[in-house]
């Protein structure tokens, strides 16, 4: 039992599920009576999602619709970092939503400090945009996972490479 066990804490999401959720939202926008004539567009790139519509009312409706579709696809709403609402050309409004992937360095340092303070038998190392948590006992690792699940973290956390 001298070997150390470990797991990684990452923050990621399934890109294909997000593509499917955005596609479902686009289809519902074309069918909904209150959004049919708004000429709303949803543009998804690897890092951002841009909503372009005719009024703030329809923007709020599209954001709510998008959040519903994303939640039904078992994606966390914490992946969205909403930018401010901008006025676009032709009396339109635009909102750019940044997609959060990976742990920021500040969040990784904060989580690392919390884990070290709470659990003395556990070692934590920051590896890029992930945390590696290791300990001799798998029970210690399980308690760390439970502790992190109870914390209110501004990013969705997944636990991978459990060995």
Curated annotation (Swiss-Prot):
<dbReference type="InterPro" id="IPR035571">
    <property type="entry name" value="UPF0234-like_C"/>
</dbReference>
<keyword id="KW-0547">Nucleotide-binding</keyword>
<dbReference type="GO" id="GO:0005829">
    <property type="term" value="C:cytosol"/>
</dbReference>
<dbReference type="InterPro" id="IPR035570">
    <property type="entry name" value="UPF0234_N"/>
</dbReference>
<dbReference type="InterPro" id="IPR036183">
    <property type="entry name" value="YajQ-like_sf"/>
</dbReference>
<dbReference type="InterPro" id="IPR007551">
    <property type="entry name" value="DUF520"/>
</dbReference>
<dbReference type="GO" id="GO:0000166">
    <property type="term" value="F:nucleotide binding"/>
</dbReference>
<protein>
    <recommendedName>
        <fullName>Nucleotide-binding protein Synpcc7942_0865</fullName>
    </recommendedName>
</protein>
<dbReference type="Pfam" id="PF04461">
    <property type="entry name" value="DUF520"/>
</dbReference>
<comment type="function">
    <text>Nucleotide-binding protein.</text>
</comment>
<comment type="similarity">
    <text>Belongs to the YajQ family.</text>
</comment>
